[in-house]
Amino acid sequence: KPFSTGISNVVHFADWIPGTNSIAFSTVEPRATAPGWQANNDLHRYSISTGERRKILDASSGGVYGWWGMTFAFSPEGRLAYARPDGIGLVDLDGKYLKPLLDITPLNTHSDWAWLPSLTWGADGKVLYFVSHAPPPSLVSEEDSPFFDISATSFESDATMQIAGQTGMFAYPSASSLQSSSRERQYQVAYLQAIFPSQSETRRYRLVVMDRDGSNRRTIFPANDAPGLEPQTPAWAPDPIDGQSGDFIAVVYQGNLWLVDSGNGQAYQVTGDGLVTRIDWK
């Protein structure tokens, strides 16, 4: 039976904490002026069982363009990464402070919104994938560069490298579950590739799948002669489904739910009313 948590003014982040019955969330203060809020850049924990609410991070300015806010991502084991307009890092949940990993040149949108680097953990929790703001191709300001890459930080080798170039600002990398049939702990990464990388703020995207190291990159949906996807995070099926050559990836395309086989690129339209806006696997 649904019940109210009493939590309000959440814009960028709320998610289950892995292995617990608690939710982590960040809040904003409503404002009459655009974009409609002032981010607190805080983090709280709420227990579904007891209703207890605990603070993890105090409110802060949030760095460059901190008024927009920040977002977070849990690894399968419960490590927490953060992203804000000027960088990414980890959250020390015991010490309750931020541990910066990498500075990112913030994007000057010349508007009342800010770009947040999207990020996701690899299925083994050893790699953090994120979208980074690439240097400009000419003499324009670094903050005005129209190019974005997908990079990865390995916590085993303590190294960061680019694995996909000029993807677009809304690439939204997403890692599959571990492939149990393999001797190695392998997984794939899906992301959105801008059709026109230098205009990725307003143009559409195609779904791409690659191995965890960026190799074997394949564009699988939609067809080259079809309109592209609106920005979204590709949603991997949590487990393999019999009869498919790869794992299913769910996307919203032209208002409908589609399932795309990551192995052969076969796509299946599930709904037809054009009313789907958000999706998730259960």
Regions found by a protein language model. Name each.
Residues 1-282:
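Sequence signature of WD/YWTD-type beta-propeller architectures
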